[in-house]
Swiss-Prot record:
Keywords: DNA-binding, Metal-binding, Nucleus, Repeat, Transcription, Transcription regulation, Zinc, Zinc-finger. One of its GO terms (biological process) is cell migration involved in sprouting angiogenesis. Coiled coil: none annotated. Residues 350-360 have a biased composition (Basic residues). It comes from the Eukaryota. The gene is Egr3. It comes from Mus musculus. This is Early growth response protein 3. Disulfide bonds: none annotated.
Amino acid sequence: MTGKLAEKLPVTMSSLLNQLPDNLYPEEIPSALNLFSGSSDSVAHYNQMATENVMDIGLTNEKPNPELSYSSSFQPAPGNKTVTYLGKFAFDSPSNWCQDNIISLMSAGILGVPPASGALSTQTSTASMVQPPQGDVEAMYPALPPYSNCGDLYSEPVSFHDPQGNPGLAYSPQDYQSAKPALDSNLFPMIPDYNLYHHPNDMGSIPEHKPFQGMDPIRVNPPPITPLETIKAFKDKQIHPGFGSLPQPPLTLKPIRPRKYPNRPSKTPLHERPHACPAEGCDRRFSRSDELTRHLRIHTGHKPFQCRICMRSFSRSDHLTTHIRTHTGEKPFACEFCGRKFARSDERKRHAKIHLKQKEKKSEKGGAPSASSAPTVSLAPVVTTCA
């Protein structure tokens, strides 16, 4: 069955229904559609309704005077009598009187045609008749009990329906915890202690949590430990002034692999290298304090220079500089012989040795043929004669 929307018609509901002929529907109603087969009085009553204006029937089943117009507000009749109309429209195929298959009698009002004031008041009163009383709705659907908190909402196990027919999985209300109590007036009651400047031997005495309090600026931003202060701490056992009365724990220096040439003489004399490495088993000495600082990072494992691209850390700034070139692709060092570029100077130096070896080989090959091509002096045989 198909339905189409009708075009906008400048007519009202009552005028649309008045144009329908009286003999539109036959008196014989099929048994499938006959709702009142047992009572002839009821059928006669509805047959009488077919010849009258549907919109002109009041609540008391009395025909009003046609000259009277509908008022803006519909007054209910005494006795609280209501009339309920039941009907069914079924179209198997397009009929002769309705080629467009208009199946809704309310199409004149739905399509947006402004109805007359009388028709508007009639539709409003009809809608109020269809709505059930509020008392019947409350009797059919009882009010929900009030809940004091969210925990009372799940007082019974919650089950989920399975469309395949399996029994539902029940969840006990213990799985759903009640609402958490509100926080007290203290915004940060407990915070963990993430102190990164304690020695591993003192970790047992540090509590896991402590009440929120003002942080010491020295703990937040500890002063940097210079290599000279580190050496003094090893030699003189002095206490660092920035940490108050707490003794400064000894700096753990990791052993490193032995030097390849431990007894190799240095170009700088010994008296010009006053800064010795304090690590046990390390005999390195340096002429400048920054060189000792850089060397101590090998023992401590401190890597303060971090790449912002891959977050890799380095102990020396020059190592970070050459590492960043791997990301940027910069190659500032060019070979003097072939023009090939490198990111590190030691790579260029290693590459230059190849050209030097090739040059030496060419010079050796060039000197060998010159020696062989030298003229050979042949001595003539000496002939002696006897007199």
